[in-house]
Amino acid sequence: MTEVARVGAVDLGSNSFHLVVAQESQGRIQVVDRIKERVGLGAGIQRRGQLDEEVAERALRCLERFHERLRGVPHRRIRAVGTKAFRDLR
């Protein structure tokens, strides 16, 4: 029996965070899990690049849920990207 290699992709956007978990099946990519959550990161950035506490908590709770969904996916097979909102943070 061959091992199924799963991969995870995390998109940390200014408005919402997305997670996709996929695997190869019979030469095709098959999405096995997908989740999107509105976080409002960009709207939560205050003066001087500080993040509003409520938005920070919402983002952390979302990332905890993503972590649970990524169980079983090797860390080296997970990629995460952040948008401009992360560059604006101090």
Language-model-detected regions and their locations in the chain:
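Conserved phosphate-binding loops in N-terminal lobes of ATP-dependent enzymes
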Residues: 3-90
